[in-house]
Amino acid sequence: MKIQKILYRAFVFTNLVLAISFMLYTLNLTRGNDLFDFQVFYGAARNVLAGSSIYTNYGAANLPFWYFPWVSWIFLPLTFFPFEIASLIFLTTGLVIVAVVIHFLTKHYQGFDIFDRTYMFSMVIWISWLGYRVGQMSYFVLGGAVLVVFVLAREQKYLAGLCLPLLLLKPHLFLIFIPLVLWMGGWKTVLTGALTTLSLFGIEFLVTPDWVRQMLGLLTHGVGCLDTNPGWKFTTLSSLIGLGQNYVGTAALLLTIILVAVAAFVVVRFHFLPKIPLLSLAMTASLFCAPRANAYDLILLVPALIWLSEKWSIKTALIWVAATLILFLSHFSAGSYLVTVMVLALCIYKANSIEKRKRVPVFLPKN
């Protein structure tokens, strides 16, 4: 075995141990007190069982439940456990989802071995530091999005529609991705997606007839709440350049519209890409123009990062390092938006290179 392989494998193992150790250290340091978002999900699920309204504030940070009803239903099984155990099950399940996502994406592109996959897994743990610290459902959102990607890639258009509510866990993160999914899936995806979503809405109407009013009440309150958190600001362009943003994402509406137009142009420009890379690009473009996003949402860049790593080398491995360093140097705050910009720029470069290789040169006959 070459010395390079031995060193690489030793590095991968060390990196994995360090990533897991740092995760456990973080969780032990905070003692679960910083699981502000998980307190919201867990509390909403408990309210479902109690027959109370889910649209209220929860936890030590008094955060609101700004999601569609079925988000609380997903967490119902966890309510049968104490909070501490439930949060551990939640985190473990999320990490399993990440491992499955990496396995299937790397299997699709091929050329990766178990050490490459392990390296990616450990880097995702680093990247998702804020996610597991506050107890966000980022791993589940990633899993739902990648599930839709593979379902569409296999032309299972009806099933793609059935999975649409998974994208609505955080619809503001999929402004480009969802329209592309509906366009690629055609009327079959649109029909089943609409029926599935309306059915879920109908169930909530039966349980809580005025849930829309309750939800809009919380959203209206969020319009006046600006992102003034000195620690973890939104990872959006508006926050990066100091324009500020509210908790609904409407404070910089004109800028958002411009970014959506740019992101849509990029995806349309490279529509010739195979389905999985194209959808990965659309996921990245969606984060680029998201009106509201946090550093824990950047885990949605993983499909694009794996595509960029298709021909595995030290250079592609360093992309993951660069993304992680930017996140930690920016303290998972507004500067983290640069990770999205970097990944999108690299995706555009790769897509452009693919297009150039596909061009067939025209040779004129000699006179």
Task: List each model region and its residues.
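Contiguous hydrophobic segments
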Residues: 136-145, 163-173, 236-247, 319-337
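Aromatic-enriched
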Residues: 310-367
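Primarily membrane-embedded glycan-assembly and transfer machineries that use lipid-linked glycans
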Residues: 1-159, 181-302, 306-310, 357-362
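A short, terminal or domain-edge coil/loop segment
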Residues: 172, 218-221, 344
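Membrane-interface alpha helices of multi-pass inner-membrane proteins
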Residues: 158-171, 175-182, 281-289, 322-328
